[in-house]
Amino acid sequence: MIRDITIGQYYPADSVIHKLDPRTKLVGTIGFIVSVFLFHTFAGYAVATIFLAGMILLSKVPVKFIFKGLKTIFRLLLITIFFNMILTPGEVVWKLGFIKVTKEGLVLAGTMAIRLVYLVIGSSIMTLTTTPNQLTDGLERLLRPLNKLHVPVHDIAMMMSIALRFIPILLEETDKIMKAQIARGADFENGNLIQKAKNMVPLLVPLFISAFRRANDLAMAMEARCYHGGDNRTQMKPLTYKKRDHVAYVVLVAYLAVAIGFRAAGI
């Protein structure tokens, strides 16, 4: 399951989505997330599905690789669906003892499941097609107006970049520790929830130690190179909007207009 997490990983490919400016992809991801919450009917989610499918095809990232990330939220998805079905009041369609499944609960469960899945896939496409350095530069440029309010934009962007960069590293470290623990007789799969939580303790302690050690090594390396942020720092590859970025913004605005129209019309 650890290997199935795709957020934070980068998949190299020669695609239109990979070539887009990181600012375009950041704004596009935010716009897609907003649209997921604007749509509230299955007709609306059909439009979101078409848009998302188009992005996946244009990204040239294997569908299997993208959907692999859904395995990590499968249990959360089941819990969300279950509690929405039995806790939402409305017309009862099925009953077993004190457990009642309502029609409204089924609709809400389906809606929440779709939203959760689309949020994960949408975020995964952005990180799979954008390197951490590109994300840092794009985020810093987008937040640059906040410099006038004395907000440390560069530091915020750098922290997010380091966090994204550490995700695959920590996942790899976790996988190594799990294999070492399993070789010593540890069992992470069997048992109830409490037993599984207890079995995770030998995994978490060395993982935290490794994370702090890596963070300390990175901090010392940055200090040794006299690293400092600021407005005077230059970029090896300055960000510039191109024609494909303008086309992407037009498509995004049209898509959001459809989402707002669906919401206003109650479709």
Indicate where each model-derived feature is located.
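Membrane-helix interfacial "entry" motifs
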Residues: 14, 37, 60-68, 96, ...
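Juxtamembrane/interface alpha-helical elements of multi-pass membrane proteins
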Residues: 73-186
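Transmembrane alpha-helix interface motif
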Residues: 1-42, 48-57, 141-144, 148-151, ...
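Alpha-helical transmembrane segments and their membrane-interface exit regions
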Residues: 51-61, 76-79
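Alpha-helical transmembrane segments and their helix-start/interface "positive-inside/aromatic belt" motifs
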Residues: 25, 64-74, 248
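Transmembrane helix-loop junctions in multipass membrane proteins, especially transporters and channels
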Residues: 41, 45, 60-64, 88-96, ...
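Loop-to-transmembrane-helix entry motif
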Residues: 69-77, 113, 117-120, 207, ...
